Amino acid sequence: MALLSSSLSSQIPTGSHPLTHTQCIPHFSTTINAGISAGKPRSFYLRWGKGSNKIIACVGEGTTSLPYQSAEKTDSLSAPTLVKREFPPGFWKDHVIDSLTSSHKVSAAEEKRMETLISEIKNIFRSMGYGETNPSAYDTAWVARIPAVDGSEHPEFPETLEWILQNQLKDGSWGEGFYFLAYDRILATLACIITLTLWRTGETQIRKGIEFFKTQAGKIEDEADSHRPSGFEIVFPAMLKEAKVLGLDLPYELPFIKQIIEKREAKLERLPTNILYALPTTLLYSLEGLQEIVDWEKIIKLQSKDGSFLTSPASTAAVFMRTGNKKCLEFLNFVLKKFGNHVPCHYPLDLFERLWAVDTVERLGIDHHFKEEIKDALDYVYSHWDERGIGWARENPIPDIDDTAMGLRILRLHGYNVSSDVLKTFRDENGEFFCFLGQTQRGVTDMLNVNRCSHVAFPGETIMQEAKLCTERYLRNALEDVGAFDKWALKKNIRGEVEYALKYPWHRSMPRLEARSYIEHYGPNDVWLGKTMYMMPYISNLKYLELAKLDFNHVQSLHQKELRDLRRWWKSSGLSELKFTRERVTEIYFSAASFIFEPEFATCRDVYTKISIFTVILDDLYDAHGTLDNLELFSEGVKRWDLSLVDRMPQDMKICFTVLYNTVNEIAVEGRKRQGRDVLGYIRNVLEILLAAHTKEAEWSAARYVPSFDEYIENASVSISLGTLVLISVLFTGEILTDDVLSKIGRGSRFLQLMGLTGRLVNDTKTYEAERGQGEVASAVQCYMKEHPEISEEEALKHVYTVMENALDELNREFVNNRDVPDSCRRLVFETARIMQLFYMEGDGLTLSHEMEIKEHVKNCLFQPVA
């Protein structure tokens, strides 16, 4: 550093002040000019020891500055250390980008394949009825048992008996051939053996089935309890008892069989018989295993409107054989009319299918192709929404937390009026959440869906906060248990899904990053566990995955071209000559491409990136580089929109102002084409408001003034620049925006205020220490501590986080309820708030992106294609 003569220290007042060439050192400007005239300094900062007014150093252009990350910290709010900031160089140099950029271009054949897949997936949505699923050998065996209603010695549904005879697997078992789950195979095989024995047919199949049972039953001991199908401990022992009566040669003395029988007896002992008939419970799903204790006249009162018992063909068949109830028979005929010669493990599955299909295409990032289809699916679900919750089917009398939480989250985000009070149905007296009313069963997938749901909370929804805490605890414990499995599904990578959800909850999960992650985790052959293993082809299939990969790579190739163009603009415009600011073109472009990624928003991404680049430059200019005189001149130039004023500006300001002037004029020309009216005055006004906020902060800094918390927030929510960025970019979202629409997202709107507030607060929580070390006196933490000198810094930081979390809940509500604002405009505001949460989740993810995970996000989003 260039040292000043200590004899001059007496001329400097006590305190800590930023000094400028013309304003703050008039008494010895000649001396300074003589020493550093070659450097043409424009900004100086004094540093002196604690409790002393002795000048130690003057830092200006041409002198050595402290690196950004090595800036001194001070314990005092009244006498911070001021140093000139020096930012780390940008990581994304051209050679780095070139080394990562894929040479693959989307071919005409791939584009044609995308069109075909889009058409086929649209047909999937349009053909959704009561649910598509695979055969259940177990349930089909129970339906095949039903004797002819005309009294003849034949099955009522002979086609189901024939299906059993024709669909035994090579190993002698029945069930899904591509996936072996011992519980499922043993249960289905036992059911088929008994049915064939009752009808005295299929001797060969019976023999092979018994052999399979004997050799494979012991494998159940090696499988996790969580893989035990629903109701297994009820129906399996009951069928074993029946098999023994029929004289079937089975290993009844196996240890696991004895254990299952003991579990059944213990469960039935705990079951008050009055509960069975008082209200619908999950026991209705397994009545075929409770035949010796059921009062059939009473149980009929709990029959669903569609004639089934909890949509289970097996349970309904058992009730029909005991009662002859016509509605049971009508239900079974209805199911067989759909599937022909077999039945699934439960049916219908209409709500489950629609919700999970929508969730799947959204998480894979291909939902922008299916907006109408998604709306139709959600309209259907909402028409069957119930304040007590929903189950997997519209006629299902028992709601479950899995379908309810999924429905609450998706419906809310799509603007449907649904209350979080619905989750109270699934909370016990200890505050824990469970899947079904009156039970304690929980699984990873249902708790994951509740957790995802809890993040779309509105202000004051304590049930959502409770759900978040409960499920986070459960899911973190599940991750620690390496042997943990989900109770309701066998998914490709449920662990990866949980890890992503916990690390990147809703407010920092950007669409492109979630798509990239879910493409890796998604299983096109995932199966679910009910009473038997079942598949949902409209939820898990290769078409979704194939389109997701093609679409991701196609969009990524477009983004790479746009980024190259922007980097060329950065250099050719002269902005690359500015040394006082951060070069973060790639990171800034990523912030846009991470959410407004669709091809039709290319201009919006371009404008968003350029305006964001300018907001960073202006922040650095007003924050530490420019003198108050020059900043005032710059602001006046923007206000008058007068290029002639650049002659009075320093060289770096000339570059900054000239490029801003030219770029904004170009944007305004394009904006006029898009909006059908002149928008230059509108854009200039947006910029003026930003510069006024920056100027106020520069004046605070010069005066060493620490404002009140509220005063700080009011100004800093503007100076964070997000409003400027959004209010200009929104002109290019493909919508003609009236003054009324603009007012709903304008400076006076709560929506925009919350975006600025949450962005400012998350920024401050991660940067206030470093900025305090550079001499900044105003941050949310410091201002709150000034008002509350009795609290610690940790307590102040906790308060700021609380304010931010509450504001994020309110932001959710504004995003969902602002239906008068076009979706693309609402997205722009909301996603800009979310990208701030992502960038500052670890620290200053813009300035220090090369040290943080942002670097990997940029790489995955913009450069690494999916295979």
Swiss-Prot record:
Transit peptide location on this chain: 1-68
| Cofactor annotation remark | Binds 3 Mg(2+) ions per subunit.
Motif DXDD motif: which residue numbers? Answer: 400-403
Name any GO cellular component annotation.
chloroplast
Give the record's keywords alphabetically: Chloroplast, Isomerase, Lyase, Magnesium, Metal-binding, Multifunctional enzyme, Plastid, Transit peptide
Q: Residue numbers of motif DDXXD motif?
A: 619-623
Binding residues annotated for Mg(2+) 2, in chain numbering: D619, D623
Catalyzed reaction equations: (2E,6E,10E)-geranylgeranyl diphosphate = (+)-copalyl diphosphate; (+)-copalyl diphosphate = isopimara-7,15-diene + diphosphate
UniProt GO MF annotations: copalyl diphosphate synthase activity; magnesium ion binding; terpene synthase activity
GO BP terms: diterpenoid biosynthetic process
Indicate which residues the UniProt annotation says bind Mg(2+) 3. N763, T767, E771
| Protein's cellular compartments | Plastid, Chloroplast
Q: Which cofactor does it need?
A: Mg(2+)
State its Enzyme Commission number(s): 4.2.3.44, 5.5.1.12
InterPro entries for this protein: Isoprenoid_synthase_dom_sf, Terpene_cyclase-like_1_C, Terpene_cyclase_plant_C1, Terpene_synth_N, Terpene_synth_N_sf, Terpene_synthase-like, Terpene_synthase_metal-bd, Terpenoid_cyclase/PrenylTrfase
Pfam families from the UniProt entry: Terpene_synth, Terpene_synth_C
Role description: Involved in defensive oleoresin formation in conifers in response to insect attack or other injury. Involved in diterpene (C20) olefins biosynthesis. Bifunctional enzyme that catalyzes two sequential cyclizations of geranylgeranyl diphosphate (GGPP) to isopimara-7,15-diene.
Q: What is known of its domains?
A: The Asp-Xaa-Asp-Asp (DXDD) motif is important for the catalytic activity in the class II active site relevant for the cyclization of GGPP. The Asp-Asp-Xaa-Xaa-Asp/Glu (DDXXD/E) motif is important for the catalytic activity in the class I active site, presumably through binding to Mg(2+).
Quote the protein name from its UniProt record: Bifunctional isopimaradiene synthase, chloroplastic
